[in-house]
Amino acid sequence: MKKPPVPLLQNGLRADGRAPDQMREVQIQVGTVSNADGSAVVSYGATTAVAAVYGPREMHPRHLSLPDRGVMRVRYHMAPFSTKDERKSPTPSRREIEISKVLREALEPAVMLEQYPRSRIDVFIEILQADGSTRVASLTAASLALADAGIYMRDLVVGVSVGLVDGTVVLDLNGLEDNYGEGDMPVGYMPNLRRFTLLQLDGAWTREKFLEALGLAVKGAEYVYQVAREALKNKYMAIAEEIYGR
C-alpha cells in the first residue's frame, strides 16, 4: 500500500480536521442549467457535480423504445480540468462508462419509468472538480435534477461514501482518503423508503466494520437529504413569490 503524504488520522481527527463521522460542507443548488428540463449542482467539500436532465421525450431510434416503460440513459463525465491528472482523450474512459451504468442502476428504483412508455429520459453528469466521492455526489445531483424536471419519483436517492482509514470507519471520503485508505463503500439510499439502491465494497471489511459503515452511511444520507429538500423548497418558494408576489 502506498504511504500517504500526511497522516490520515491523528488524535481522533482526519487530515482535513473532521471527525470520523463528519461530512464535509454540503452545498446544493437546484435549477442551475437554464436550457435543461431539470438540473442541480452538488458539492461535497471540493468535489462538485452538475447534473442536467432532458425529457421525457420521444425515443429515437424508435425500435429502442419499450411499450410499457421509459428508458433512462445516464452519462457521467469528468471535465478535463476536474483533477490534476492530464486527460489526453476526449472519449469516455472505461471508468466513466462503468460509473454511468452504476448510477443508472442506482437511480432506476426511484424513478417511475412505467409512467413514460415509449419515452426516454437523458441524464448528463459533469464532474467540475474531483476530491473524492464523485460518484455519490453525482448520484445526489442526478436525483435532484430528475425531481427538478418534474419526473415522477418514489423518493430522492442520496449518495454518500464511507471508508476505512487506519482501521476507523469514516464518512464522506476526500481524495486523500480515497487514494490511501484501506477500503471504500459508495452508497445510494432512499431515506423515506429506507432502501439502498447502491452498495459497492472495495477493500477488506469485517462484518462489524461493515455494519458500522452502513449505519454511518444512513446517518450521512439523512443529513444530505435535509439539505437537498431545503434546496428544492427554496427554488419553488422563490418561483411562487415571483408568480403570486408573496
UniProtKB/Swiss-Prot annotation:
Q: Where does the record say this protein resides?
A: Cytoplasm
**EC annotation?**
3.1.13.-
Keyword set includes Nuclease: yes
**InterPro entries, sorted:** ExoRNase_PH_dom1, ExoRNase_PH_dom2, ExoRNase_PH_dom2_sf, PNPase/RNase_PH_dom_sf, Ribosomal_Su5_D2-typ_SF, RNase_PH, Rrp41
Pfam families documented for this protein: RNase_PH, RNase_PH_C
- GO terms of biological process kind: gene expression; rRNA catabolic process
> Transmembrane residues, as ranges?
none
Keyword field: Cytoplasm, Exonuclease, Exosome, Hydrolase, Nuclease
Instruction: Provide GO CC annotations from the record.
Output: cytoplasmic exosome (RNase complex)
**UniProt-recorded Gene Ontology molecular function terms:** 3'-5'-RNA exonuclease activity; RNA binding
Instruction: Tell me where it mainly resides.
Output: cytoplasm
Q: Which NCBIfam families match?
A: ECX1
Q: Which family does it belong to?
A: Belongs to the RNase PH family. Rrp41 subfamily.
What function does this protein fulfil?
A: Catalytic component of the exosome, which is a complex involved in RNA degradation. Has 3'->5' exoribonuclease activity. Can also synthesize heteromeric RNA-tails.
* Subunit relationships: Component of the archaeal exosome complex. Forms a hexameric ring-like arrangement composed of 3 Rrp41-Rrp42 heterodimers. The hexameric ring associates with a trimer of Rrp4 and/or Csl4 subunits.
Protein name stated in the entry = Exosome complex component Rrp41
Q: Which organism is it from?
A: Pyrobaculum calidifontis (strain DSM 21063 / JCM 11548 / VA1)
- Gene name of the record: rrp41
